[in-house]
């Protein structure tokens, strides 16, 4: 019985430590996103330009343009993401962009 209690306690501690680590990573990502918003406000890439795949679609100019990456682009060095025309959902999603004033009419 005591073995089961100890194993359960160790399992809880392990899960808790992973949760704390994930929370720290999330806080770091939020801090980076806050820094990136200033950059997004200043610039918007034209259609067809090379964009950064792990950032938001707000970096591409236009309501319907999004950063589109090829399949498994993270594992291929030569693969680059480009600003390409998306669907209507892209325009709805980009309403919350900080630099939307650049392309909205």
From Swiss-Prot:
Propeptide residue interval(s): 18-41
Function: Insecticidal to house crickets. It induces an excitatory slow-onset impact that leads to irreversible spastic paralysis. It also modifies human voltage-gated potassium channel Kv1.5/KCNA5. Most likely, it binds to the voltage-sensing domain of the channel, suggesting it does not block the pore but prevents its opening at physiological membrane potentials. The recombinant peptide binds to the channel in an irreversible manner and slows down the hKv1.5 current activation kinetics. It is not toxic to mice, when intracranially injected (at 0.5 ug/g mouse).
Protein name, entry field: U2-lycotoxin-Ls1e
Family label: Belongs to the neurotoxin 04 (omega-agtx) family. 01 (type I omega-agtx) subfamily.
Signal peptide region: 1-17
InterPro entries the UniProt entry points to: Toxin_34
Organism in which the protein naturally occurs: Lycosa singoriensis (Wolf spider)
Pfam families listed in its UniProt record: Toxin_34
Location within or outside the cell: Secreted
S-S bonds: 51-67, 58-97, 60-83, 69-81
Keyword Cell cycle: no
Record lineage: Eukaryota, Metazoa, Ecdysozoa, Arthropoda, Chelicerata
Gene Ontology molecular function, alphabetical: potassium channel regulator activity; toxin activity
GO cellular component, one term: extracellular region
Keywords on record: Disulfide bond, Ion channel impairing toxin, Neurotoxin, Potassium channel impairing toxin, Secreted, Signal, Toxin, Voltage-gated potassium channel impairing toxin
Keyword Signal applies: yes
Tissues showing expression: Expressed by the venom gland.
């Amino acid at each position: 019985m005591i073995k089961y209690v100890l194993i359960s306690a160790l399992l809880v501690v392990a899960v808790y430590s992973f949760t704390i680590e994930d929370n720290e990573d999330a806080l770091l990502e939020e801090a980076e996103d806050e820094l990136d918003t200033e950059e997004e406000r200043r610039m918007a890439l034209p259609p067809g330009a090379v964009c950064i795949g792990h950032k938001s679609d707000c970096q591409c100019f236009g309501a319907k343009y999004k950063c589109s990456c090829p399949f498994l682009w993270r594992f291929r060095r030569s693969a680059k993401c480009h600003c390409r025309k998306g669907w209507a959902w892209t325009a709805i999603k980009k309403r919350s962009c900080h630099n939307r004033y650049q392309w909205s009419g």
